[in-house]
Amino acid sequence: MRRDKKRSRKRVCSFCVDKIEQVDYKDVNRLRRYISERGKILPRRISGNCAHHQRQLTRAIKRARALALLPYTAE
C-alpha cells in the first residue's frame, strides 16, 4: 500500500520574520494564535516557529497563564 504524502510549503517563523528578539508574555493577542481551541500550546510542526522562538513562546504562554492573562483551559 502506498501512502500519498501531502506536500505543503515550509512555514516560516513569524517571530523571525517580524524580527522579534523576545516573546512578550503581555502580548496576549499574539500568544492566542499559538493556543488550540482546547487550550493546548500548538507544536512547532504546526505553528511553524523555529526552535528558539518556540521555547520562548512556551515560557511566555505558561507565564501569562500563571498571571491569569490567558486561561489554562478552553471556555
UniProtKB/Swiss-Prot annotation:
- UniProt-listed PROSITE patterns: RIBOSOMAL_S18
* Known role: Binds as a heterodimer with protein bS6 to the central domain of the 16S rRNA, where it helps stabilize the platform of the 30S subunit.
HAMAP family in the record: Ribosomal_bS18
Q: Name one GO biological process term.
A: translation
Gene Ontology MF term list: small ribosomal subunit rRNA binding; structural constituent of ribosome
Return the InterPro entries for the record: Ribosomal_bS18 (IPR001648), Ribosomal_bS18_CS (IPR018275), Ribosomal_bS18_sf (IPR036870)
* One Pfam family cited in the UniProt record for this chain: Ribosomal_S18
Which cellular components does GO assign to this protein?
cytosolic small ribosomal subunit
Any transmembrane segments, and where? none
Report the family membership: Belongs to the bacterial ribosomal protein bS18 family.
Q: What is the lineage of its organism?
A: Bacteria, Bacillati, Bacillota, Clostridia, Moorellales
Q: Could you list this entry's UniProt keywords, alphabetically sorted.
A: Ribonucleoprotein, Ribosomal protein, RNA-binding, rRNA-binding
Q: What's the protein here called? A: Small ribosomal subunit protein bS18
| Quaternary structure, from the entry | Part of the 30S ribosomal subunit. Forms a tight heterodimer with protein bS6.
